[in-house]
């Protein structure tokens, strides 16, 4: 069972198995913001900046949680989530978006994602979602 502790970053520190977090985004801002927390948790961080790299990584490595920017899948849109689920149906997928668009959120949630994160909600919500997804993936 996971026990919540608070690390130096002030974010929850989960006592669970370490895992690998894959962040799929352009620009790398999210991975830079999460790097300290991920290291503090004992997790590994992998990053990709395109759909091809994402799919290749999922086929070749054990990934515990995927955090993907909603804009990453280029022309594939929501179909990309179905393809990812086809590779690993139990993979917790967290989608990040800059704006809260209810129609987009509804379509994405129908794909069976773990969490839909609007960036303006702040990093604490995202960190909590990643922590919960890591716990789920280790069960």
Residue ranges with predicted function:
Residues 1-37, 124-139:
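Non-catalytic signal-transmission and effector/linker regions of two-component phosphorelay proteins
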Residues 47-65:
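Acidic, metal-coordinating helix/loop segments flanking the phosphotransfer/catalytic sites
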Residues 50, 76-79:
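Acidic catalytic/metal-coordinating carboxylates
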Residues 66-70, 97:
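Active-site residues of response regulator receiver
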Residues 73:
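The feature encodes the CheY-like receiver
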Residues 78-89:
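Short amphipathic alpha-helix used as the core "switch/output" element in two-component signaling
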Residues 79, 99-117:
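Alpha4 helix (beta4-alpha4-beta5 surface) of REC/receiver domains from two-component response regulators
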Residues 90-102:
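A short, hydrophobic beta-strand element within the central beta-sheet of small alpha/beta folds
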């Amino acid at each position: 069972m996971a026990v919540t502790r608070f690390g130096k970053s002030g974010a929850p520190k989960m006592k669970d198995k370490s895992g690998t977090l894959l962040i799929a985004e352009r620009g790398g801002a999210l991975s830079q913001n999460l790097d300290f927390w991920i290291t503090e948790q004992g997790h590994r961080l992998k990053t990709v900046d395109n759909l091809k790299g994402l799919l290749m990584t999922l086929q070749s490595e054990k990934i515990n949680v995927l955090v993907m920017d909603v804009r990453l899948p280029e022309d594939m849109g929501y179909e990309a989530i179905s393809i990812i689920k086809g590779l690993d149906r139990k993979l917790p997928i967290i989608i990040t978006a800059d704006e809260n668009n209810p129609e987009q959120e509804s379509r994405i949630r129908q794909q069976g994602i773990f969490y839909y994160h609007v960036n303006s909600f702040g990093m604490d919500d995202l960190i909590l979602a990643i922590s919960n997804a890591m716990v789920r993936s280790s069960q």
